[in-house]
C-alpha cells in the first residue's frame, strides 16, 4: 500500500505499526496524544493494514525458514478486513470533521475491542503545507480468522471475520455414544456493526446444551436471535438490545419419566437507553463532564410446557417470570492507556471515572408480584504511577408485605503499577469481595464454587447466605516468546469464609488456596488463553481433593465499554 505521507513512504506498514506501538505512550489518558491537534480539519483518512503474522526486528531473527514459511502460508489463507468495514467503524469523516481528542481516544478503544482485530491505532500526521489540517492514519492488524476448540466430546470450528466482512460463523458438533441421538450440532452467525449502524446481530441454534440452560442436570435445545447496540461513544444518544429464544429440554440420556424434566419455554428480552446533555457535551467539552442517562428493560420467560413432577411445580426455575425495570445513571468516564493487565503486552484501555445507578421495577414470578429498588456505585481511580483501583458497592431488594431477597455486595480490586525486573514485567493485584443475602425468598444459598469464591473449588457441602473472599495474585510476564506465544507465570493466594445471614462471619472457619501456574497466549490467534495451574487447598472439605491440577482455556477479560448496560437486579451468586 502506498501512503501519501512523507514519513511513511516506502515503508512496510508493519514496520510503521510496530514503531507506533513501540513509541505509543502508556500510563497516560488515552486522549493525550491527540490534544495538540484539537480542532484541526481532517483532510484525509488513510487506512493501513498489516498482515496477521507481520513481525519485525528480533521476532524475524528468531523465526526464519520453516516457521516463516508457515506464517506466510497462514497469511495467504487469511482474508484481511475489508477497508469499508474499518471505515464504517469510524466516528469521524474526512473533509468536514475536525479532530476531537476525546472522540479519537474512544474510537481507538472501539477498534481495539473489535473481536477480529488483534490491535489498532489511530495516528495523526501533521501536514507541512498547511497548519490547520491533518491526515488521520488508521493502522490495523487482524487476528487470524480461523479457530477451533475441543472440550470433552465437543468439536467447535469458527471464523471470526468471514471473508473480511466483520462477520463471524461458528459450527460445533458433539459425539457422545451414551446419548440419543449420539450426534448433536450447533451453528451461529454474527454480523458486527451492520451498515455502520453500530448494531451487532446474531442468530443461531444449538442441540448440545451450550446456551445457558435454566437449571443444572438438564439438557436443552435452543433457537435464538440477538441484537445489540451499545452507547459506544460519548455523543451517541441511544442504545439497546433485543433477545428472542425458544428452548426445550431433551431426554438425551433416556431417563425414566420420574427423573426427566420435560419442559419448553419462550424468552423475550428488550431494553433501551437514552443519554442526555449530548449537545451540552459537544459545546463545553468532554473533560470532567458528568453525563446522565435513563434505560428501561422488559423481560418475560414463558413456559409452554412445565415438568410434570410435583417437586418442580413451585420451583422458580420452572415457572413464568416477567419484570420491567428502569434505571437512572449519573456517570463520568475517560480512558487510560496501559499494558500488562489482562493482555500480554499490547495496549489496553482502562476506564477512569464513576457511575451511580438507581434502579426500580416490578417483577411477577410464580404469580407473586413485588417491587424492586436498588442502588449501585462504581468507581475506577487511576493513580500517577499507573496503579489503579476499581471499587463497586450495591444494595437492592424486593418488597412484598415486607422486604425480601435483599442483596448487599462490595467489590474492590487494586492493580499495582507495572514493575520492570531486568527484562521481565510484574504487576500484582489484591481483591476483596463481600456478599450477603437477607430475608431470602427466591434466592438460594451461595457457595465457594464461583469466580468470587475460591479458584478451583468444587464442593457442595459448603453453603451459606454470607461470603467474604480476600485474595492476591502476582503476574510475571516473560520477555521471550516461542512461535509467537507469550508467557505469564502467576502465583495466587485466597482465603474465604461462609456463614449464615444472621451470624458474625468472622467467627467461621477459613478456607484457602495457594497456587501457581502459567498462562500462554498468541495474540495473533483468536484462541483463548491457555492456563496450566497447580493448587493446594489446606483444610478442604471432604468432597474435594486437597491438591488440584488444571488445564483450561480462559476467555479474554476486558473492562466494560460503557457504564450504560442493560438494567439488572443485583445478583446473589
Could you describe each region identified by the protein language model?
Residues 407-409:
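Amphipathic hydrophobic-ligand
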Amino acid at each position: 500500500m502506498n501512503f501519501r505521507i512523507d514519513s511513511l513512504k516506502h515503508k512496510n506498514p508493519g514496520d510503521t505499526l510496530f514503531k507506533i506501538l513501540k513509541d505509543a505512550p502508556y500510563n497516560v489518558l488515552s486522549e493525550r496524544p491527540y490534544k495538540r491537534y484539537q480542532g484541526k480539519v481532517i483532510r484525509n483518512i488513510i487506512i493501513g493494514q498489516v498482515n496477521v503474522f507481520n513481525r519485525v526486528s528480533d521476532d524475524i531473527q528468531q523465526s526464519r525458514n520453516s516457521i516463516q514459511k508457515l506464517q506466510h502460508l497462514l497469511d495467504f489463507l487469511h482474508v484481511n478486513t475489508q477497508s469499508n468495514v474499518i471505515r464504517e467503524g469510524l466516528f469521524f469523516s474526512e473533509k468536514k470533521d475536525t479532530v476531537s481528542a476525546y472522540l479519537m481516544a474512544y474510537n481507538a478503544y472501539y477498534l481495539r475491542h473489535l473481536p477480529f482485530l488483534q490491535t489498532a491505532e489511530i495516528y495523526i500526521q501533521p501536514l507541512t503545507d498547511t497548519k490547520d489540517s491533518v491526515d488521520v492514519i488508521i493502522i490495523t492488524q487482524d487476528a487470524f480468522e480461523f479457530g477451533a476448540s475441543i472440550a470433552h466430546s465437543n468439536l467447535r470450528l469458527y471464523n471470526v471475520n468471514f471473508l473480511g466482512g466483520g462477520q463471524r460463523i461458528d459450527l460445533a458438533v458433539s459425539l457422545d455414544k451414551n446419548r440419543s441421538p449420539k450426534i448433536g450440532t450447533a451453528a451461529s452467525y454474527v454480523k458486527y456493526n451492520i451498515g455502520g449502524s453500530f448494531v451487532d446481530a446474531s442468530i443461531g441454534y444449538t442441540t448440545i446444551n451450550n446456551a445457558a440452560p435454566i437449571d443444572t442436570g438438564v439438557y436443552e435445545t435452543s433457537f435464538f436471535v440477538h441484537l445489540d447496540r451499545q452507547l459506544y461513544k460519548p455523543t451517541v444518544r441511544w442504545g439497546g438490545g433485543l433477545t428472542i429464544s425458544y428452548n426445550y429440554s431433551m431426554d438425551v440420556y433416556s431417563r425414566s419419566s420420574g427423573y426427566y424434566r420435560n419442559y419448553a419455554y419462550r424468552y423475550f428480552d428488550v431494553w433501551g437507553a437514552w443519554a442526555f446533555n449530548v449537545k451540552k457535551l459537544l459545546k463545553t467539552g468532554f473533560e470532567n463532564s458528568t453525563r446522565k442517562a435513563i434505560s428501561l428493560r422488559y423481560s418475560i420467560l414463558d413456559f409452554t410446557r412445565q415438568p410434570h413432577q410435583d417437586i418442580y411445580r413451585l420451583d422458580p426455575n420452572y415457572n413464568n417470570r416477567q419484570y420491567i425495570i428502569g434505571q437512572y445513571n449519573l456517570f463520568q468516564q475517560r480512558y487510560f492507556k496501559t499494558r500488562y493487565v489482562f493482555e500480554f503486552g499490547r495496549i489496553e484501555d482502562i476506564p477512569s471515572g464513576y457511575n451511580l445507578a438507581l434502579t426500580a421495577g416490578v417483577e411477577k414470578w410464580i404469580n407473586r408480584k413485588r417491587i424492586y429498588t436498588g442502588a449501585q456505585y462504581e468507581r475506577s481511580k487511576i493513580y500517577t504511577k499507573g496503579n489503579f483501583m476499581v471499587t463497586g458497592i450495591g444494595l437492592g431488594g424486593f418488597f412484598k408485605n415486607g422486604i425480601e431477597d435483599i442483596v448487599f455486595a462490595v467489590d474492590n480490586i487494586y492493580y499495582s503499577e507495572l514493575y520492570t525486573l531486568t527484562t521481565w514485567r510484574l504487576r500484582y493485584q489484591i481483591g476483596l469481595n463481600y456478599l450477603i443475602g437477607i430475608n431470602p425468598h427466591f434466592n438460594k444459598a451461595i457457595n465457594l464454587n464461583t469466580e468470587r469464591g475460591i479458584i478451583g473449588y468444587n464442593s457442595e457441602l459448603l453453603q451459606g447466605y454470607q461470603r467474604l473472599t480476600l485474595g492476591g495474585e502476582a503476574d510475571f510476564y516473560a520477555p521471550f516468546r516461542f512461535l509467537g506465544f507469550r508467557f505469564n507465570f502467576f502465583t495466587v493466594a485466597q482465603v474465604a469464609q461462609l456463614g449464615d445471614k444472621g451470624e458474625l462471619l468472622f467467627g467461621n472457619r477459613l478456607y484457602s488456596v495457594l497456587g501457581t501456574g502459567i498462562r500462554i497466549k498468541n495474540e495473533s490467534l483468536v484462541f483463548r488463553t491457555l492456563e496450566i495451574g497447580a493448587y493446594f487447598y489446606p483444610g478442604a472439605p471432604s468432597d474435594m481433593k486437597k491438591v488440584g491440577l488444571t488445564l483450561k482455556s480462559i476467555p479474554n477479560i476486558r473492562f466494560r465499554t460503557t457504564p450504560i448496560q442493560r438494567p439488572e437486579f443485583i445478583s446473589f451468586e
